[in-house]
């Protein structure tokens, strides 16, 4: 691990939850942006348009 010295500045008990929280928030923001700025994603989640038989 080439970034191992970061734990001499920031303790792991503070840094790990901070990093994991930042990753989770970023993922939620990306998903929210996709949901609100596309027209196809909601239809994809609903399974698309059903064709009449």
UniProtKB/Swiss-Prot annotation:
Residue ranges that the UniProt entry lists as topological domain Cytoplasmic: 1-14
Topological domain ranges for the Periplasmic compartment: 36-53
Pfam short name (any one): LHC
Subcellular location(s) per record: Cell inner membrane
GO MF term list: bacteriochlorophyll binding; electron transporter, transferring electrons within the cyclic electron transport pathway of photosynthesis activity; metal ion binding
Listed GO biological process terms: photosynthesis, light reaction
Membrane topology category: Single-pass type II membrane protein
Keywords of the record: Antenna complex, Bacteriochlorophyll, Cell inner membrane, Cell membrane, Chlorophyll, Chromophore, Light-harvesting polypeptide, Magnesium, Membrane, Metal-binding, Transmembrane, Transmembrane helix
InterPro entries in UniProt: Antenna_a/b, Antenna_alpha, Antenna_alpha_CS, Light-harvesting_complex
Residue intervals passing through the bilayer: 15-35
Residues engaged in binding a bacteriochlorophyll: 31
Main location per the UniProt record: membrane
A single cellular component GO annotation: plasma membrane
Role this protein plays: Antenna complexes are light-harvesting systems, which transfer the excitation energy to the reaction centers.
Subunit structure: The core complex is formed by different alpha and beta chains, binding bacteriochlorophyll molecules, and arranged most probably in tetrameric structures disposed around the reaction center. The non-pigmented gamma chains may constitute additional components.
UniProt record similarity statement: Belongs to the antenna complex alpha subunit family.
The name this protein goes by in its record: Light-harvesting protein B-800/820 alpha chain
Organism for this UniProt entry: Rhodoblastus acidophilus (Rhodopseudomonas acidophila)
């Amino acid at each position: 691990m080439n970034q191992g010295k970061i734990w001499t500045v920031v303790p792991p008990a503070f840094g790990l939850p901070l990093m994991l929280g930042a990753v989770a928030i970023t993922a939620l923001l990306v998903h929210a942006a996709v949901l609100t700025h596309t027209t196809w994603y909601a239809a994809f989640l609903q399974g698309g348009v059903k064709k009449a038989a």
